[in-house]
């Protein structure tokens, strides 16, 4: 069990931000990353659709063998986390609570913004997560096209900046000093987002906090791979055409991505 990989799941390349954080924190651990590109994007689909597609992929990953699952997708975390934790014997880590914890501790004026896909914002998953911090003044905003820009390999352009100004207007007007990037694709757009909201606003990505959660769970359950073990072998797969994911993945993650298989 200790030598099985950590499973990381997303609809596309966004979860690679989480994968990178896990690789940096746990370099001895192998990863099994699956992108459900056949059903991308999740952010514009209904909760029922995301649950159906996501659980089908997670079923396959568990059958293939993983010691822990990371749902590295905010839309999927909000739609199927409870089902996944009831369905599988392996621990399941998600990305919403880690980001909320970090934002609550980071805000200075108590005004926190959350941006995400339409599905994530409509689910009110972040509203529910912040219920335990009633002193926080929360502002949420959907950013429908951000994921499309990332999946097209665009991280800075005039069109992107115009979209960002429109989407982020409620955050700026409210005076939020902390902004949760509530989609794992969004850290790739951090430069454009910072240009709009200003350098004084702290951008919170769930990636590093999620990696720490993975570490804590592995240690508490005795699932860490021995440091003396051979170098890990990572596996990457896509449910759709693997070529676009492979091309973008190498750009965003680096040489760790080798051959991408079709799931």
Swiss-Prot record:
Catalytic activity: L-glutamate = D-glutamate
Pfam families with a match to the protein in the record: Asp_Glu_race
Pathway assigned to this chain's UniProt record: Cell wall biogenesis; peptidoglycan biosynthesis
InterPro entries: Asp/Glu/hydantoin_racemase, Asp/Glu_race, Asp/Glu_racemase_AS_1, Asp/Glu_racemase_AS_2, Glu_race
EC number: 5.1.1.3
Keywords for this protein: Cell shape, Cell wall biogenesis/degradation, Isomerase, Peptidoglycan synthesis
The keyword Transmembrane helix is assigned to this record: no
Binding-site residues, substrate: 10-11, 42-43, 74-75, 184-185
Database matches in Gene3D superfamilies: 3.40.50.1860
Keyword Secreted: no
Gene Ontology MF annotations: glutamate racemase activity
Recorded superkingdom: Bacteria
GO biological process: cell wall organization; peptidoglycan biosynthetic process; regulation of cell shape
Residues forming the catalytic site: 73, 183
Record function comment: Provides the (R)-glutamate required for cell wall biosynthesis.
UniProt similarity note: Belongs to the aspartate/glutamate racemases family.
Name of the protein: Glutamate racemase
Species for this entry: Acidothermus cellulolyticus (strain ATCC 43068 / DSM 8971 / 11B)
Lineage: Bacteria, Bacillati, Actinomycetota, Actinomycetes, Acidothermales
Gene from which the chain derives: murI
């Amino acid at each position: 069990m200790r030598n099985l990989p950590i499973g990381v799941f997303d609809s596309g390349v966004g979860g690679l931000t989480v994968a990178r954080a896990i690789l940096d924190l746990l370099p001895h651990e192998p990863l099994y990353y699956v992108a459900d590109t056949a059903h991308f994007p999740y952010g514009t689909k209904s909760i029922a659709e995301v649950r159906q597609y996501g659980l089908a992929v997670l079923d396959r990953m568990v059958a293939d063998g993983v010691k822990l699952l990371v749902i590295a997708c905010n839309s999927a975390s909000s739609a199927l986390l409870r089902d996944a934790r009831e369905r599988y014997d392996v621990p399941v880590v998600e990305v919403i609570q880690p980001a909320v914890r970090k934002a609550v501790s980071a805000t200075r004026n108590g005004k926190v913004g959350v941006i995400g896909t339409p599905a994530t914002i409509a689910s009110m998953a972040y509203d529910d997560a912040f219920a335990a911090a009633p002193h926080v003044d929360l502002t949420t905003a959907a950013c429908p096209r951000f994921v499309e820009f990332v999946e097209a390999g665009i991280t800075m352009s005039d069109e992107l900046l115009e979209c960002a100004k429109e989407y982020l207007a409620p955050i700026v007007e409210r005076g939020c000093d902390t902004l949760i990037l509530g989609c794992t694709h969004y850290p790739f757009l951090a430069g454009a987002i910072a240009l709009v909201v200003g350098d004084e606003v702290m951008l919170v990505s769930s990636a590093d906090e999620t990696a720490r959660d993975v570490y804590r769970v592995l240690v508490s359950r005795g699932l860490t791979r021995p440091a003396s073990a051979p170098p890990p072998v990572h596996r990457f797969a896509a449910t759709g055409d693997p070529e676009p994911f492979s091309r973008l993945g190498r750009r965003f993650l680096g040489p760790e991505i080798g051959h991408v298989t079709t799931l």
